[in-house]
Design a protein with these regions (language model features):
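Short helix-boundary/capping micro-motifs
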Residues: 12-27
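Short, solvent-exposed amphipathic helices
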Residues: 61-75
Length: 88
C-alpha cells in the first residue's frame, strides 16, 4: 500500500527535480527521501526514478505515480476540509 508520505515525496521529487530539494521542501533529510523512495519502489515492484548524479529523473512509472499523487493529495485535502466543516 502507498501512504500519503510516499505520494508527497513523489510529488516533491517531480516538482523539485532532486532528492535534496524535495527533502528540504518536506522537512526530511536527503537520505530519508532516498530510503523512502527505495521502499516505495520495492512495494510497487518497479523503479520510479533514474538517478543521474545529483539530479533524478522520474521513470515513466514514476511520472504516472507523481501525476496521480497530485490528484489524490488534492482530493484528500478537500475531504479533510469538508469533514472538518461538517464537524462544526
Amino acid at each position: 500500500m502507498i501512504d500519503t508520505a510516499g505520494l508527497r515525496i513523489m510529488r516533491a521529487i517531480s516538482e523539485q527535480g532532486s532528492f535534496t530539494a524535495a527533502a528540504h521542501s518536506l522537512g526530511y533529510t536527503q537520505p530519508a527521501i532516498s530510503q523512502m523512495v527505495r521502499r516505495l519502489e520495492g512495494r510497487i515492484g518497479t523503479p520510479l526514478v533514474e538517478r543521474q548524479g545529483r539530479t533524478v529523473r522520474l521513470t515513466q512509472a514514476g511520472q504516472v505515480l507523481a501525476r496521480h499523487a497530485v490528484t489524490v493529495l488534492s482530493l484528500l485535502d478537500t475531504c479533510l476540509l469538508y469533514t472538518s466543516d461538517a464537524a462544526d
